[in-house]
A protein has these predicted regions:
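Solvent-exposed soluble domains appended to multi-pass membrane proteins
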Residues: 52-444
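N-terminal secretory/membrane-targeting segments
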Residues: 1-83, 115
């Protein structure tokens, strides 16, 4: 029972065990109670002025005669729209593991090759530090809300995910995972959002040449994925495949004889093995009839470590992404600041279909010169809004902090910029309420 207008005082005076139990059941920290807020209309106006106001899904899927959807060759660097998307979501792949970002160890020869032949995103930032945060961002295109990822929360079914948006437009959404999908509620989340779900329990035993407690070897995951993609392609459906790898994770073991680092090879060995497996997958895919019509997206779920001297060390969220489609895409680098939540609307934009305006994220190919380049980074409690050289952090007890971010990622306390403060609040407050009020539901 509340006795004060001060939420923090009420929490201190309450029954700690009961409060903790309730928080566990809800899997959330109530943004409206614990974080700085704005009037809802002011928050909506800020997002509208930033060009980031979400449309309802009905509006987003409704053709606009004044602004018809379709593949726009004038702003999208592909020769034509792909028919299929295969997204490889790589476990714990920090940008600084890649030679493309200056690593001298030679751990990622194949990824560096694809980066050279594809479109490399050099300033992409993950929203969090766990796989479920990455899946949330890449699938829902929403800023992280305090507490647990939406993937692990109750009432997370029938949301307007990337798959839900594409299914009625002729796509077969599929989620593949090399581990046990009940972990972190992955199976329930994707099944509840119209994805065909396939995890390690669905693969024939004879097809698994190596496995550990965390998952099957990535190469064997990809072998099984290829068979499923072939069958889906034969059915005549367009494909959206989201593949979550596992090998770049403790215990860092993998099949021997693939790379020059024997198993268990620690982090370096796991990164190099994952690189090998991805390279082999794409080599095999080149022989498939659907390859030339497919956009491959290689992106990390999060970094291997987000440790640092500050609460939200910006370099600990820097991840790589490569778009690869040798018959469709001109090689290059995209050097602007991008958030993980921008990937889903970008893919819808590239496919030339309806629905990208429903996401909080914005297609990178629609972000004009005046667009506020920003990224969202978080841990369980702190919510960061990063804009090139400044990080605004929202925390419990309505706390707001600002840091100047140097080129090497060093954070120095700075005076609060009211405009950026309000932008941060507008995004996080609106995202929290959208989920809580069922506004992210597909049929809302």
């Amino acid at each position: 029972m509340a006795f004060s207008n001060n939420a923090y005082a009420n929490e201190l005076a309450g029954n700690g065990v009961m409060t903790f139990g309730a928080a566990l059941r809800r899997n959330e920290l109530d943004y409206s109670r614990f974080y700085a807020t704005l009037p809802d209309e002011q928050a909506r106006k800020i997002l509208r002025d930033l060009g980031s106001e979400r449309e309802t899904l009905i509006e987003a899927l409704q053709p606009d005669i004044n602004e018809p959807e379709g593949f726009d060759k004038s702003r999208i660097p592909l020769t034509r729209a792909p028919k299929h998307v295969v997204m490889i979501m790589v476990e714990s792949l920090s940008a600084d593991f890649l030679g493309s970002f200056g690593n001298p160890k030679g751990l990622t020869p194949r990824l560096d090759e694809f980066a050279e032949k594809g479109l490399l995103f050099t300033q992409l930032y993950a929203t969090g530090t766990r796989t479920v945060r990455g899946l949330e961002a890449l699938t829902l295109g929403t800023p992280p809300i305090p507490g647990q990822s939406i993937v692990r929360r109750p009432n997370n079914e029938q949301l307007a995910t990337l798959g839900e948006v594409l299914r009625p437009q002729g796509f077969e959404p599929m989620f593949f995972y090399g581990g046990y999908g009940y972990f972190d509620n992955m199976n329930a989340f994707f099944q509840g959002n119209s994805y065909q779900v396939v995890d390690r329990t669905d693969f024939p035993k004879a097809s698994i040449g190596f496995e550990n407690v965390w998952g099957i070897g990535d190469e064997f995951l990809f072998n099984n994925v290829l068979e499923r993609l072939d069958k889906t392609h034969e059915s005549g459906k367009r494909m959206l495949a989201q593949i979550m790898t596992t090998s770049n994770h403790r215990p860092f073991t993998y099949a021997n004889g693939r790379i020059d680092i024997p198993s268990p090879g620690g982090r370096d060995g796991a990164v190099k093995y994952t690189d090998y497996a991805i390279g082999r997958f794409l080599d095999d895919a080149k022989n498939k009839p659907w390859f030339n019509d497919t956009l491959f997206v290689i992106v990390a779920d999060h970094c291997a470590s987000a440790a640092g001297k500050s609460k939200l060390p910006v370099p600990g969220y820097h991840i790589p992404m490569v778009m690869y489609a040798p018959k469709l895409l001109k090689p290059g680098k995209y050097k602007e600041l991008v958030s993980q939540i921008d990937i889903a609307p970008t893919l819808i934009d590239v496919l030339g279909v309806e629905g990208d305006d429903h996401f909080f994220g914005t297609s990178v190919f629609e972000q004009g010169k005046n667009f506020q380049r920003r990224a969202f980074i978080s841990n369980y409690q702190e919510l960061g809004y990063f804009t090139q050289n400044q990080l605004t952090v929202l925390g419990p007890k309505q706390k707001v902090e600002t840091f100047r971010i140097a080129k090497d990622g060093t954070a120095t306390p700075a005076e609060i910029n009211e405009q950026l403060r309000n932008e941060a609040i507008a995004f996080y407050q609106t995202a929290f309420k959208a989920f809580k009020n069922n506004e992210l539901k597909y049929k809302k």
